[in-house]
Amino acid sequence: ASEDGGRGPYVQADLAYAYEHITHDYPKPTDPSKGKISTVSDYFRNIRTHSIHPRVSVGYDFGGWRIAADYARYRKWSDNKYSVSIKNMRVHKHNSNRKNLKTENQENGSFHAVSSLGLSAIYDFQINDKFKPYIGARVAYGHVRHSIDSTKKITGLLTTSTPGIMSGVYKVLRTPGAHRESDSIRRVGLGVIAGVGFDITPKLTLDAGYRYHNWGRLENTRFKTHEASLGVRYRF
């Protein structure tokens, strides 16, 4: 331990692995919402992904309690999904002409936790001169962007062997339930922190930590992250 009891300002740099759970309350195909019916699939309503990102912090160590401000920026998630189904509508017995309906669904979605600016209060447990487990609480101002573009196209197809009649499209039905949405939202959320610090030198500490954060109610979106991180903390 140092002569000043470990007190003083510090900086910390971490590399974090984040598990991200994103839930969107988009209108459902079977549940009209405000007169609109959505074609958004469950895949884009309930997203589970992960990312690796850096995090930087500045704080002050009071010799037991610490306060810290941190900043992180996450990786953007995006994906698309295409599906097609063909339904037989009618077969003419006398000439075997067949009418089918072809339904195509195209979805493009993205989600980006643009930034998180947090303030934490942390308590270090003094186990010995080297190891210091800790727990803490965090409040953060987060900024997220998300978008969805979901469309459905229904096409009538005619298959025929009748001379003089060509197979092909016989009608295109009105596209039902297209859903397009793009939001940029800022909210305050709450989280918890836990981990352990190992003093390499009196001023340099290796830090292994975990944090859970609920980003709050983001309009029609809920966002939660679990993060495991490894970093170093230098006290001046």
From Swiss-Prot:
GO CC terms in record: cell outer membrane
Record localization: Cell outer membrane
Gene Ontology molecular function, alphabetical: porin activity
Keyword hit for Transmembrane: yes
Signal peptide per UniProt: 1
SS bond list: none
Keywords recorded for this protein, A-Z: Cell outer membrane, Membrane, Signal, Transmembrane, Transmembrane beta strand
Pfam entry (one): Opacity
Family: Belongs to the opacity porin family.
Other facts noted in the record for this chain: Expression of opacity proteins is regulated by the number of translated repeat elements CTCTT, which code for part of the signal sequence; the protein can only be synthesized when the number of repeats place the start codon in frame with the rest of the protein.
Function: Implicated in a number of adherence functions. OPA proteins are implicated in pathogenesis and are subject to phase variation.
Name the UniProt record assigns to this protein: Opacity protein opA50
Organism of this sequence: Neisseria gonorrhoeae
